[in-house]
């Protein structure tokens, strides 16, 4: 397994798909990285030469991925909560942030339904 940005990427898959195992790299970004590195999308990871691996690593190092990206996202959310914006309040309360309806759904964000005690007579 090749190791890129601290992530073991699978040997048997095509490089364009294997790069998506790194947090922050999707298919479009993966294609751009390979084009900039001059590597074909169809080649398998196990067939990469050491020079090609180094070229891919250099391109990935130029992008914010993995821990740095996670840290930036968490800091952005924390900043929203500190300034008291609407989005920050929704994050703090554990409710949907992007305007979704919460009357019936939003169970993933709100957690398991809790019965109201003393509702029955």
Curated annotation (Swiss-Prot):
Q: Which PROSITE patterns match?
A: RIBOSOMAL_S13_1, RIBOSOMAL_S13_2
Gene Ontology CC terms, in alphabetical order: cytosol; small ribosomal subunit
Q: Where is this region: Disordered?
A: 96-121
Per UniProt, the ranges with Basic residues bias are 106-121
Molecular function (GO) terms for this protein are:
rRNA binding; structural constituent of ribosome; tRNA binding
Pfam family of the protein (one): Ribosomal_S13
Keywords (alphabetical) are: Ribonucleoprotein, Ribosomal protein, RNA-binding, rRNA-binding, tRNA-binding
Q: Which InterPro entries match?
A: Rbsml_uS13_C, Ribosomal_uS13, Ribosomal_uS13-like_H2TH, Ribosomal_uS13_bac-type, Ribosomal_uS13_CS
Q: What does this protein do?
A: Located at the top of the head of the 30S subunit, it contacts several helices of the 16S rRNA. In the 70S ribosome it contacts the 23S rRNA (bridge B1a) and protein L5 of the 50S subunit (bridge B1b), connecting the 2 subunits; these bridges are implicated in subunit movement. Contacts the tRNAs in the A and P-sites.
Family under the similarity heading:
Belongs to the universal ribosomal protein uS13 family.
Instruction: Relate the assembly described in the record.
Output: Part of the 30S ribosomal subunit. Forms a loose heterodimer with protein S19. Forms two bridges to the 50S subunit in the 70S ribosome.
Q: What is this protein called?
A: Small ribosomal subunit protein uS13
Which gene is transcribed and translated to give this protein?
rpsM
